[in-house]
Swiss-Prot record:
Protein name, as recorded: Ribosome maturation factor RimP
Gene Ontology biological-process annotations: ribosomal small subunit assembly; translation
Compartment(s) where it occurs, according to its Swiss-Prot or TrEMBL record: Cytoplasm
Pfam families on file: RimP_N
Lineage of source species: Bacteria, Pseudomonadati, Spirochaetota, Spirochaetia, Spirochaetales
Amino acid sequence: MVKIVDNSEVYNLIKNVTDRLGIEIIEINTFRKRGEGRVQIVLYKGDDFGVDTLCDLHKMILLNLEAVLKYNFSLEISTPGINRKIKSDREFKIFEGKKIKLMLDNDFEEGFILKAGADSFIFKTDNKEVKVLYSDVKKAKLS
């Protein structure tokens, strides 16, 4: 019987590798169709890391996953990208200090995430600083 792995299992398998290198796991997606699989992982480190680091991470993570996954799969590793949609409260903390586009009503406003807390974050624009509840955010993306 072929073991099907879920996102939390992949997270647990790679967490020690990413922790040692000071890298945050932003997102994991696993897909399985007709005996083939795909694992997509988005990683982030405050000071950007290059292609060489991504290649090394790919090798290390692939070895960890191959030990558990007993079916053919491809592994895709990437960084968040410059226009990444912020998908969780946790990501506001990860991206503290970064410039974002934020939609609370119907228009985007550009500013920075100054500080992220448990239920809100401080958003700074050119002329104001406001406390924003995560529940009030319609959309947010890196800018």
